[in-house]
Regions:
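Bacterial N-terminal signal peptides that target proteins for export
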Residues: 2-15
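C-terminal segment of classical bacterial N-terminal signal peptides
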Residues: 18-27
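Short beta-strand edge/turn micro-motifs at domain boundaries
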Residues: 113, 133-158
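A solvent-exposed, acidic/Ser-Thr-rich amphipathic alpha-helical stretch
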Residues: 32-39, 53-108, 117, 130-132
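A short acidic/glycine-rich loop-to-helix N-cap element
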Residues: 29, 125-131, 159-160
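Hydrophobic/aromatic side-chain positions at a characteristic register within alpha-helices
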Residues: 49-50
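Beta-strand elements of well-folded, non-transmembrane domains
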Residues: 120-124, 140
């Protein structure tokens, strides 16, 4: 009978602890090292684009099941393969400059969310340079010891707003 009582107390204590953990809000951890790694991944993708490297190289950090929302398509784009094939179509413009403003990384274990304002310059087919501005979010997950981009949302912002 004593073992049953001890077990019951342990089970009750464990249940209470579990309920307290479930009710506790999750807060992002401050991790400057992970924040630097995540921001560097976005910047390296931009550098690869500006250098004109192949799309496979530009998309090397995308997960196979990558998804994206952007201002060019009204639907969810699904898959690294789709993203790479769409990027291989010769664009009418070229990235000349890309920068991250107000970057913030929230870390939740093996998940990191990068939120920032994108400020870039693109040269159009007519040779004119125009700003490229967006409110952006990227979600990275650590897979096999490497950070992989699993989702992105790029919301264009009109110049001057």
């Amino acid at each position: 009978m004593m073992n049953l009582t001890n077990w019951s107390r342990g089970a009750a204590g464990g249940t209470i602890a579990l309920l307290l953990m479930i009710g506790t809000p999750v807060h992002a951890a401050e991790n400057p090292q992970v924040a630097a790694e995540i921001m560097a991944l976005a910047r390296s993708q931009w550098a690869s684009e500006i250098a004109g490297e192949p799309m496979a190289q530009q998309n090397s950090t995308l997960a196979e099941d990558y998804t994206e929302f952007n201002g060019d398509f009204p639907t969810l784009l699904v898959g690294k393969t789709m993203s790479t094939r769409m990027g291989e179509v010769t664009p009418n413009d070229k990235a000349m400059y890309s920068d991250m403003q107000n970057g913030r990384v929230q870390v939740y274990g093996d998940t990191a969310i990068l939120t920032y304002n994108f400020a870039g310059l693109r040269r159009g087919a007519d040779g004119k340079v125009a700003p490229a501005l967006a409110k952006s979010s990227r979600v990275y997950v650590k897979q096999g010891g490497q950070w992989k981009l699993v989702h992105a949302n790029f919301a264009p912002v009109a110049a001057g707003h």
